[in-house]
Amino acid sequence: MLDVNAFDKLKIGLATADDIRGWSYGEVKKPETINYRTLKPEKDGLFGEQIFGPTRDWECACGKYKRVRFKGIVCERCGVEVTRSRVRRERMGHIELAAPVTHIWFFKGVPSRLGYLLGIAPKELEKVIYFASYMVTSVDEEQRHQDLPDLQDEFDHEVQNLERRRNNEIEERAKKLEADLAELEADGEVKGSAKTKLRNGAERDMAAIRQRYDDQIKRIAAVFDKFKSLKPGDMESDVDLWREMEDRYGDYFEGCMGAEAIKKRLQDFDLEAAAKELREEIETGTGQRKARALKRLKVVNAFLTTDNKPEAMVLDVIPVIPPDLRPMVQLDGGRFATSDLNDLYRRVINRNNRLKRLIELGAPEIMLNNEKRMLQEAVDSLFDNGRRGRPVTGASNRPLKSLSDMLKGKQGRFRQNLLGKRVDYSGRSVIVVGPSLRMHQCGLPKPMALELFKPFVIKRLVDLNYAQNMKSAKRLVDRGDSEVWGVLEEVISEHPVLLNRAPTLHRLGIQAFEPILVEGKAIHLPPLACAAFNADFDGDQMAVHLPLSAEAQAEARSLMMASDNILKPADGHTVTMPSQDMILGLYYLSTVIDGAKGQGRIFSSLEEAQMALDKHEIDMQAKVLIRLPQDFVLPKDWEPGEVQVIDPEPGSPDVVKEERFADGSVLFATSLGRILFNDTLPVDYPFINEQAPKGKLSKIVDDIATRYSTQQVAATLDALKDLGFTRAPWSGVTMAFSDIVAPPDREEIIKGYEAQAAKVNNQYDLGLLTEEERRQELINLWTECTDKVAEAMRENFHDDNNVNIMVQSGARGNWMQIRQIAGMRGLVANPKGEIIPRPVKSNYREGLSVLEYFISQHGARKGLADTALRTAESGYLTRRLVDVSQEIIVREEDCGTTHGLPMTVAERDENGNLVLVKAADGGPYSRLLAQDVLDPADGKTVLYHAGDALSMDVLNDLVAHGVEQVIGRSVLTCESKRGVCAKCYGWSLATNKLVDVGEAVGIVAAQSIGEPGTQLTLRSFHSGGVASASDITQGLPRVTELFEARTPKGEAPISEFAGTIKVQDTERGREVILQPDDDSLEPITYQVTRRAPMLVKDGQHVDPGTQLVEGSVDPKKILRILGPRAAQMNIVNEVHDVYRSQGVDIHDKHIEVIVHQMLRRVTVIDSGDTDLLPGELVDRARFREQNKKTVAAGGRPAAGRPELMGITKASLATDSWLSAASFQETTRVLTEAALNEKEDDLKGLKENVIIGKLIPAGTGLARYRNATVEPDKAIRDTIYPNFGLGDGSLGGDLSDGDLGDVDFSNIDFGDLKLGDDFNPDDFLDDNDNPVDFGDEFRIDPDELK
């Protein structure tokens, strides 16, 4: 087989008949598959062993040669080569067709490539191919021109002859009439009626004679006229006329029906002349003609610039794919199940053989044509069943799967087998929580671990002499002997495994853990990893994968460990957060209760306080004063305060004060719980002396993540988790029915609002309010009522109420849910998303009435249906995003651009002070500066230089200096030829360091946008009747609309030019008229609805691109009026707004990566002196390069306009045909690629996955492939703590004397596996001679004695 690393490009083209014969190992002549008695393949049939190879390894068909020693021999009896049976997966055969057939992809595809090339309408082409029309293939112009005068004379002569004969016959008939009349008169009967009858009969006969001869003359005139103007490519569907022409003038032209005619035309087709003619037509033509000429020129050009031959679109030979790819298997009842392809091939072979026989018998043309048409149809259905006419069906009327269907869709070859392979060394099981596991550990069930690590265990058993060979070791493992488990423990230690939970929506869906063996059959997952996987323990399952090679293990350990993946790549916030019980425990510890037992007592040390707690002298939540040492880190901005003493001793003060002593120690007021809580945080972290609900905890963890190494953050999180779980039961928080307290004045509040509602209804009845106004009034009333009840309810909850603690701490639930249980349910929406003006006054604690239940359920069920739809919709969006951006990889450190985007860092608050912008962490944060930032105070001092990173600290500093805007580098302004550069991308949000070269930022971006897609609503809930909100698409459909660059629903117009606005109302609505400043331009009228809120006033002056009314703007128009940068920024901001409105944080840089791909192409308007074609879509980089070359050679560059493409279109327009074909419209993409002989240079990820190469991203890049793995300092310090050696550096001032008293001879180094990595070849040079290490490594033989 071909080695995937042996090539770096993949080209697709049209195969000629010789190519197909070259691939083939023999011709398939019979339609038979296997013999039903012997179950052996039939000779020369579709499964023949002579063609495709033996069905059994190293055995020929007749059994003469068996065993591997006859390898390569071809049996003289049965003609089968002795080889492995797997060649039946790769050897092809072929069928020699008795008549040529066209390839349906090139004839029936849209547009029809054959039709474009020959300049024939597809309908006409179809008539020729399916034997309904004749086609002229060649005309002997010269001979015809020479003989035309003679032929004209001949024709005139024949016409005269016919006219003469006609006149003669008519004359004879007239004479006969006269004779008949005379006879009548002679008989004496002179009745008028008899004469009339005779005359009428004679006239009828003469008219018939005249008609007959006229038809003949007309016929030969038509034949002659047709012949005179005959040219190749002419068609004739009148069979009689064609035959007449063939009989008379057959020497001067040739023509036929079917694919044969097409083939002859293609062989004689002059591409150069056609291209020249089309170019002229493009220059002179207009409108439709020009457009068609452009399209035709593309096809003609494709053949001119490649090695493809046009006649290869017509097949004389068709390939037969290897039999193991279209297998036939025996079922239980002796019946056979077979691949549909075998039926389709069988039809082709049957019809082909019948046609051969008819040709040999010399059958008449009509029979041959019919058989040829059937053969064409059989080949069509083999290649693409159902593309033309009714599909061929199998049993139970199911259309058969053709070769095209094998490639297409989710179940096709591309997506099912090439992009979605099954993986060995993997298992799956249900997950349960492992509260005692560290963040980097997972529990693996013993049986699963044994199966996964089997090869490793077997090798180790043999190494340790528990078994003599692998076979007996395997038996030991299968029996599960006691020594096996010990070896398994040893094998799995420090061998990470990967855990994956479907759906893998972002890269945190697969992480590495160190396995710990556990009993049972469930995988144990550390609770802190749940958020990243979006896992819970209600029956979720997870898959385990085993990295095998040392490189894979190193990669898993250094890049994928769960303890290293603490930040979310979408926004840079911590994804690993304490939750639920942990929060409850930590909240309990950090709460101080006023008046708790022991408040105000003073302790001389922490130990003393702990002792008092153990003796129940003080409460854990009591505020006490403890003297703490000088290295204690006080809270930020600490000022000494005072504490009230509870039950003071007689004569002692009732207030005690905090103070700092001369020795640096400090008397500090806090609770013992808070000290325990702070013990888990890093030693030098400022003391947190306040209550820590979820929000506060989140801030603390985020802060620690920015200040400390990942290892320290992971350790802190683990400590917080342990403390939280340990202390949660201490808090005694449980939930009972009695904890849900309804507010006592609930009924009163509701009664008051009922009276107001009655008043509103009364006004409606009197006609004072419209239906819409009443509805809005009621909605406002009941919303106010619900809020009042909720407020009363919150005030009624006591601080130590269990439900209150859960909500306040952020452990579970929110006030809205509690309001529905204890307060009132309030207003609900119907399935349309409109609010029903009748409120649900009951709550769930007391139960709903029937009517209330019904109106509640309606919207609730709709919600569930919506969620299911949303998941699918969001998954499809992610798939398109990944496809469009998968080739964006950080390719270089710096592209050298000086451009960037203006970014706002500060805004004014309501008091007019400068504050950091709200979306700073999703905009300027984590980018590098493109230009120096000057101090606004003097305009000279450089605060930060170009290339500095904008961390949160830097941003705050800029705001403090009064800087409002900076120029930051962005993916949109990056000038890398392929992908993007690290400096334009900025920090990787998952590490808070500059992104590494090789990072697949495109896929990270797609996942970051797609992953929260399910959280976006499918439709906006609107409070019925508010026009502005309801007309604008929101949520997921809005994101799709933006990324697909569609014209938005409810589009808002923008001004085309600078000018003055005039607003006037008309009968139909409202008109906004723009009077341009430039008088040469006509005024423009925009029709808008009266409901749409205006953004401009009558008489206002506007700039180009100003939005006139509220609504969504069409990005294509922004591109046209304001240019590409404005269009890009519009899409980025709009997408960001949709996510922000749903409370989802995504960094703008991810959206920019996608938008960068949407504007990658340029439409050529004028090709200048380049090789580009007008109207062609080309990559911006290629466009620039072509122009550079042309200008350098002194030519005229091409002109083009940037093209905004939706993500689906952009994916299909990618340079990689493998990637495009595996996305959508597979057959169309492959047709196009084959015609243009496209080369895929395998630069993206998909194409490499498809052919089975390492992806060119991450550690797959050449620059990382030869790297050596060493632990970094932080890890080294945690593995090898300094054992008091000198100054703390490892082996600081270590001298021989320090170890003088160590007896090395008695130390057992057994477990250290010293010398495992020792390779004797390291001491040999390239020619296998010992390496000379120079003098310092020379050993004097005397020293060894």
UniProtKB/Swiss-Prot annotation:
Zn(2+) 1 binds at residues 60, 62, 75, 78. GO terms for cellular component: DNA-directed RNA polymerase complex. Residues 1325-1345 are annotated as: Disordered. Keywords: DNA-directed RNA polymerase, Magnesium, Metal-binding, Nucleotidyltransferase, Transcription, Transferase, Zinc. The keyword Zinc applies. The keyword Metal-binding applies. It catalyses: RNA(n) + a ribonucleoside 5'-triphosphate = RNA(n+1) + diphosphate. SMART domains: RPOLA_N (SM00663). It comes from the Bacteria. It is an enzyme of class 2 (transferase). Binds 1 Mg(2+) ion per subunit. Zn(2+) 2 binds at residues 895, 974, 981, 984. Residues 1335-1345 have a biased composition (Basic and acidic residues). Its EC number is 2.7.7.6. Belongs to the RNA polymerase beta' chain family. This is DNA-directed RNA polymerase subunit beta'. The gene is rpoC.
